[in-house]
Amino acid sequence: MTIHIFLCFLLILKIVNALKSNRFSSYIYTPKTFLYNNKSIPNKKLVRKFVNRIKLVDDTIKSNEHIIKITDNATNKIKELQKECNDDYLILKLYVENGGCKGLKYKLNPIKKNEIEEDDYIQQFDELKFILSIDSTSVIYIYNNTLDYSNDLISGGFKFINPNATKKCGCGKSFNV
C-alpha cells in the first residue's frame, strides 16, 4: 500500500513539474562537455543547459538574419510557384501544430497579404518575390530550420530539416523538441 502511495506521489510531482515548465524555453542535452564560466568541462552524464529560444529569435531579427534557410531545390520550386501566382509576391504561412507520430508537425499554406497577422515574424526574400509569414507561437520550433524540396514519389514535397528536433518520425513529417 505504501508503495502505491509513493508511486502516486511521484506521478503527481512529475505532473506538477511539467505544468510549471515554460513553453518558450528548451533544454539542450550535451553528452560530452559543457561550458561553465567559458571553460569546457568534460561530463560523463547528460547535463541540462537552459536555452532561451525567444531571445535567440529576437537577436536574429535584430541582426537581420533569416529564421529559416532555403536550399537550392526549395528555391527552384518557389520560383515555379511564384510564376503560377497572380500576386506580386508568393506568400506562405508557416506554423507548427499538434499531430503526427512524434507530437508536432509543420503546416505550410498559401495566404493573401491581408491574412498576415500582426504578431507574425515576416521573412522576405526579394530576389524570389517570396514572403514567409511565420506564426509567432511556432517560431521557437522553426528557428534555425532549413526548408528543402524533394521530387520523390513517396514523401516528396517541401521538407524541413530541423537541427533542434530530438525525435523525428520515420516519414519525416512530424518531430518533437
UniProtKB/Swiss-Prot annotation:
Keywords tagged on the record: 4Fe-4S, Apicoplast, Iron, Iron-sulfur, Metal-binding, Plastid, Signal
Binding-site list for [4Fe-4S] cluster: 101, 169, 171
PROSITE patterns registered for this protein in UniProt: HESB
Molecular function GO terms recorded: 2 iron, 2 sulfur cluster binding; 4 iron, 4 sulfur cluster binding; metal ion binding
Entry superkingdom: Eukaryota
Any GO CC annotation of this UniProt entry: cytoplasm
Pathway membership, UniProt: Cofactor biosynthesis; iron-sulfur cluster biosynthesis
Stretch forming the signal peptide: 1-18
Gene Ontology biological process terms, A to Z: iron-sulfur cluster assembly
Keyword Iron-sulfur: yes
UniProt-annotated location(s): Plastid, Apicoplast
UniProt family annotation: Belongs to the HesB/IscA family.
Assembly and binders: Homodimer. Homotetramer formation is observed in vitro.
Function in brief: Participates in the sulfur mobilization (SUF) pathway for iron-sulfur (Fe-S) cluster biogenesis. Involved in the pre-assembly of [4Fe-4S] clusters and their transfer to target proteins.
The protein's name: Iron-sulfur cluster assembly protein SufA
Taxonomic path: Eukaryota, Sar, Alveolata, Apicomplexa, Aconoidasida
Encoding gene (name): SufA
